[in-house]
Amino acid sequence: MGGLDDFCNDPIAAQKLVLAFSITYTPIMIYALKVSRGRLLGLLHILIFLNCSFTFGYMTYVHFQSTNRVALTLGAVVALLWGVYSFTESWKFITSRCRLCCLGRRYILAPAHHVESAAGLHSISASGNRAYAVRKPGLTSVNGTLVPGLRSLVLGGKRAVKRGVVNLVKYGR
């Protein structure tokens, strides 16, 4: 990196600046993946994908002009792997958001996995597109979450009750 003296005259100064921010904030974003969920998690995956794709492109461009090709090759491989992972997670996030938009206006900001009940929308934890709903006299629970007056269940942006995906046991034990 150069100093600020030749910043305006350097033709690739903007690329160097973006790369510096990319290298600095990528570990912070990766840690934020552990502590975030929902819409923030999806947006973080999109940011990390853009970050990794820029870093990969810059490293492959510089690779052919550098003398230390091993380090750049390893960095490009790591950026490529993180980019592929973030792309798949971003794709899941975008498709679930689009499915929720297709359900109607009131579902646009809803969680991807939720239960619609008499009291409103309740977020549930679901592994994949599976949930287990149990109705007993006096209560209904979905994946261990008590739900007053179950109306419908949405998993991954799709209504699950109408599709027969949910195990609904009436008066189970």
From Swiss-Prot:
It comes from the Viruses. InterPro entries: Arteri_GP5 (IPR001332). Keywords: Disulfide bond, Host membrane, Membrane, Transmembrane, Transmembrane helix, Viral envelope protein, Virion. Residues 33-39, 91-173 are intravirion. It is found in: Virion membrane; Host membrane. The chain crosses the membrane at residues 12-32, 40-60, 70-90. GO terms for cellular component: host cell membrane; membrane; viral envelope; virion membrane. It holds the Pfam family Arteri_Gl. Residues 1-11, 61-69 are virion surface. It is a multi-pass membrane protein. Heterodimer with the membrane protein; disulfide-linked. This heterodimerization is required for transport to the Golgi complex. Belongs to the arteriviridae membrane protein family. Major envelope protein. This is Membrane protein. It comes from Porcine reproductive and respiratory syndrome virus (strain Lelystad) (PRRSV). The gene is M.
